Amino acid sequence: MVEFMIDRASGMPAYLQVVRQVREALRLGWLHPGDQLPTVRDVVASSGVNPNTVLKAYRELELVGLLEARQGAGTFVAATLGGSASPESLARLHHGLADWVRDAHAAGLEDEDIEALLRVVLTNTPLSGNGSGPNTKGESA
């Protein structure tokens, strides 16, 4: 089950942090259709946010078809996001990326620098192996 981490100093509204974290968990395969999300009461107890904040996040995710609220039963994942990478591939990539982030910090980069560099690489790295041209997937970083 996902546990939400709310960063009050981030400047991002708490409900958007919940939405982002659910979307990330879906994209990374940590949540699957049928999985139950924490109850509003549990999220409030663990994070200290207002119940309406959690309800707003869950409602927004329900409106786009990612969650399903079942009366008296809770909130469940209705759909997933992301590609078809295996859990093993995701774990390997996560480990490699964590090493890269540690190296970037050791080189003196701050989190914002790392995010900017990653956006540039995502935008300018070709999806095919031919090494020419920017990312042509049609998505922005």
Residue ranges, per PLM feature:
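Residue cluster at the C-terminal edge of the helix-turn-helix DNA-binding motif
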Residues: 46, 63-66, 107, 124
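A short alpha-helical element within helix-turn-helix/winged-helix DNA-binding domains
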Residues: 36-47, 61
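Extreme N-terminal segment that seeds HTH/winged-HTH DNA-binding domains in transcriptional regulators
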Residues: 1-36, 42, 91, 95, ...
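Short, hydrophobic-biased segments on the C-terminal half of alpha helices
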Residues: 22, 58-59
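Beta-hairpin "wing" of winged helix-turn-helix
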Residues: 30-35, 62-72, 78-80
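Short, cationic-aromatic polyanion-contact patches
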Residues: 15, 39, 73-90
